[in-house]
Amino acid sequence: MASKDAQNQRRGLPGFLPGAPDPDQSLPASSNPGNQAWQLSLPLPSSFLPTVSLPPGLEYLSQLDLIIIHQQVELLGMILGTETSNKYEIKNSLGQRIYFAVEESICFNRTFCSTLRSCTLRITDNSGREVITVNRPLRCNSCWCPCYLQELEIQAPPGTIVGYVTQKWDPFLPKFTIQNANKEDILKIVGPCVTCGCFGDVDFEVKTINEKLTIGKISKYWSGFVNDVFTNADNFGIHVPADLDVTVKAAMIGACFLFDFMFFEHSLAGL
């Protein structure tokens, strides 16, 4: 009796797939070699196949269609009038912080290269783990010098390149391209002819490669006269489809940092 119960328990083990043969019954030998080859070539169940995983730390980005970036006010820079390392809070639509970004650069570059300085921005999650690294080399920022324009390298996780943000030469409009790890164009970003804001928001449209369809925008929010004149603290919003690839969203976060350096870092530029 005990042996029969043990056999029944073995037959009901949860590890067997529905419709799988009884392990106590031997499979009939096939006399046709073709049938044996067909059995060996059967695909594995989907539960055993490797799944495409997101870069660690970017899982939360897959749920967002609005990402808010808030630059922290540096009191020391306000008092002394010096350029300090930028710090940013990255939040969801509810204002909850999901990431924190800190600029790494040397004082010499901040003093003498100003907004053109080379730097590295390290983005960490709320546990302090670095999830995105943004590298910015020293480049030009002029429509009169189209050979050495701005470029960012996006790594997620650190050490793994997932994309680039590159400036494209245009005599009238600020234009940028988001590229994948192979430097293939994915999306374009087109800004307005005048980026000073004039007491309002400044929108950079996110478009398809042919620039015929707008799928989102990156907005620099006007923070008010006092804040924009006396501080360099800026607020940005990234509006994109929620199902957009998380590595592209990470590149857009890097693009916000680049726009801040290029167009809004000086106090009067935000007006």
Curated annotation (Swiss-Prot):
Region Disordered, annotated ranges: 1-33
Q: Single Gene Ontology BP term?
A: plasma membrane phospholipid scrambling
Q: Where is the composition biased (Polar residues)?
A: 1-10
Location of region: Proline-rich domain (PRD): 1-45
In terms of SUPFAM superfamilies, this protein maps to: Tubby C-terminal domain-like (SSF54518)
Q: Which Gene Ontology cellular component terms are annotated?
A: plasma membrane
Please name the InterPro entries in this protein's record: Scramblase, Tubby-like_C
Q: Which GO terms describe its molecular function?
A: phospholipid scramblase activity
What's the family? Belongs to the phospholipid scramblase family.
Q: Which PANTHER family match?
A: PHOSPHOLIPID SCRAMBLASE FAMILY MEMBER 5 (PTHR23248:SF25), PHOSPHOLIPID SCRAMBLASE-RELATED (PTHR23248)
UniProt domain comment:
The N-terminal proline-rich domain (PRD) is required for phospholipid scramblase activity.
Record's protein name: Phospholipid scramblase family member 5
Supply the source organism for this entry. Homo sapiens (Human)
